[in-house]
A protein has these predicted regions:
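Activation of the activation-loop gatekeeper triad in protein kinase-fold domains
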Residues: 169-173
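Helix-rich C-terminal or lid/interface subdomains of diverse kinases
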Residues: 184-249
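Conserved HxN/HPN-centered segment at the entrance to the catalytic loop
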Residues: 46-57
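Conserved short submotifs of the Hanks-type protein kinase catalytic core
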Residues: 62-76
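ATP-binding glycine-rich loop module of kinase domains
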Residues: 4-36, 43
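An alpha-helical support segment within catalytic cores of ATP-dependent transferases
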Residues: 104-150, 158, 166, 241, ...
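AlphaC helix of the protein kinase catalytic domain
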Residues: 77-86
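Internal "kinase-insert"/substrate-recognition segments embedded within catalytic cores
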Residues: 85-113
Length: 249
């Protein structure tokens, strides 16, 4: 492999283009278990028939772990939204349609979302009483087994030149309640400084899925708490501001 064409830099990893491959190289010290789990997630999602880059190999490059997948030529939905603000509503419609397609799939060997969230809530920097309330609420939520992306945002969708969407970055994929995945996307859009887009997105999703907005709101403090254990201080503070169970009773 000749890795000199950087196409993206993310926390703990750098993505290169090598001909018809996209190679994600993880920083030294990155958890081997997390890397192998990401590759396994991607392989399991391939089997659902969703449009995703096929995984080609897991290897070592210059002493670092790397995952090689098909390179998908195109622009991210985030880029298209930036370049064509007049088409924002059209792109959000597509965004919601793709997410609903993800939720229509099942992958029974994926980690259970509820188990992962319980672990994360236990690690969150919140008081024991609030943690107890959140664990209790999580246990009371309906148990589903839909594929959840876990990081579904416009930068993780590539639109090819012929208009075909591909979904990338399956590191956080789980099976569980789709509304938790929607709450996560809503918070991601807020974190990106796009509160108006987040609200429009949620309205669209509720309309298309015929789901009450109050149901998603019940997930917000749970999802915010579980996500607060990673990210920088500003992100943690923002997410923890949503962790007020009483407000959503």
């Amino acid at each position: 492999m000749k890795l000199d064409n950087i196409i993206a830099v993310r926390a703990g990893k750098t993505i290169y283009r090598d001909g018809d491959k996209a190679v994600k190289v993880f920083n030294s010290g990155y958890s081997k278990a997390d890397i192998l789990n990401e590759a396994l997630n991607q392989a399991r999602i391939e089997e659902t028939g969703l449009n995703i880059p096929k995984i080609l190999e897991v290897t070592m490059f210059d002493g670092k772990w790397a995952i090689a997948s098909e390179f998908i030529e195109g622009k991210t939905l985030a880029q298209l939204m930036e370049e064509n603000p007049d088409k924002l509503c059209e792109y959000l419609e597509l965004f919601v349609d793709i997410q609903m397609q993800v939720h229509s799939k099942k992958a029974p060997l994926l980690t259970k979302l509820k188990d992962k969230m319980n672990r994360k809530i236990s690690q969150a920097e919140i008081d024991a009483t609030t943690r107890y309330d959140l664990h209790t609420r999580l246990e009371g939520m309906p148990k589903h087994d839909k594929v959840c992306h876990g990081d579904f945002n416009p930068s993780n969708i590539i639109i090819t030149n012929d208009g075909t969407p591909y979904i990338i970055d399956w590191a956080h994929a789980t099976q569980g309640n789709a509304s938790a995945d929607v709450a996560r996307t809503y918070l991601l859009l807020w974190l990106d400084g796009k509160a108006d887009v987040a609200k429009t997105y949620l309205d669209l999703f509720c309309k298309k899925s015929d789901t009450a907005k109050q149901y998603f709101q019940k997930w917000l403090p749970i999802v915010a708490a579980s996500q607060s254990v990673k990210g920088n201080k500003a992100e943690r503070d923002f997410l923890l501001s949503w962790v007020d169970v009483v407000d959503y009773e």
